[in-house]
Structure formats: structure tokens, C-alpha cells
Amino acid sequence: MLLDDLYEIVEPITADLGYILWGIEVVGSGKLTIRIFIDHENGVSVDDCQIVSKEISAVFDVEDPVSGKYILEVSSPGMNRQIFNIIQAQALVGFNVKAVTLAPVGSQTKFKGVLERVEGNSVILNLEDGKEISFDFDELKKLRVSPDFS
């Protein structure tokens, strides 16, 4: 699978450069966009993104993991970072999040609330209406931090 191959190639590159690979997202059809999110204990600058992008591009030129043309984007995960795995979710307990499910729960697929806790492979949200809801992480299409500026 493309995503697994990309992680296998990109993880050692980012680690060797001193960055944390936060996640990889592949979007589009035809000409793909490969988004690589990096983090660092001191934050991530534009220069950091350029360094990582240059190294990854050089390896992609040799390994050729993507057939056809693609766009490579390297950035920090940002304040409204996507949560790519259960370990990241555990570290973000207490944060406001938005969740999108793969299949409707009741009649909705979008939920907003506080990431209350993580139990095994499940995330438990305290929704804005005070109700608690649990999702298996694999049932989520997307889970993202939703900063509250109020």
C-alpha cells in the first residue's frame, strides 16, 4: 500500500534529521499531493520544512514510490493538527477536537467536543451537549485538534 511504503521511506529520513514524523496524508486522484507533517520539540520553521523536503525529494527520486507526477508538501502539523494514531490521541487528551466518522452514527458523521480519554483503541469525546461518545479509532475518517480561541 502506498501510505505504508511512504512511512517506511520517510520515517528514517525525518528521524535522521532530528524531526518527528507526525503523519502523512495522500490526497487527490491522478496527480497526487503527498503531505508530510513534521514536528520538533522546538517547533518547525519554513527552513526546517525546506530541509526535510529536499532530503525526501532526493530519496523519492531514487526509490520512486509514487507512479506518475505528484506534489510534495512538507509542513508542521499546526495548531489544528490531525491526529493520525491512538498514541497521538493519548497525548492530546483534554484538547478540543473535531471527529469525522467513516459511517454515520445515528444520522451524523461529524462530532465536536473534548477528547476526554483514550481506552485501548477507542477515543472518548465529551460532546458540546454534555453527552459522552466513544469511537474505535479505526472508525474515524479524521480526528483533528480544534483550538478554542474564546
UniProtKB/Swiss-Prot annotation:
A single cellular component GO annotation: cytosol
Alphabetically ordered keywords of this record: Cytoplasm, Ribosome biogenesis
Main localization of the protein described in the UniProt heading = cytoplasm
Instruction: Fetch the Pfam families from UniProt.
Output: DUF150_C, RimP_N
| Compartments reported by the entry | Cytoplasm
Which GO BP terms apply?
Answer: ribosomal small subunit assembly; translation
Q: Please, which domain of life does this record's source organism belong to?
A: Bacteria
As for family, the record states: Belongs to the RimP family.
This chain's function reads: Required for maturation of 30S ribosomal subunits.
**Alphabetized PANTHER family for the sequence:** RIBOSOME MATURATION FACTOR RIMP (PTHR33867:SF1)
Kindly provide the name given to this protein in its UniProt entry. Answer: Ribosome maturation factor RimP
Name its species.
Answer: Francisella tularensis subsp. mediasiatica (strain FSC147)
Q: What is the lineage of its organism?
A: Bacteria, Pseudomonadati, Pseudomonadota, Gammaproteobacteria, Thiotrichales
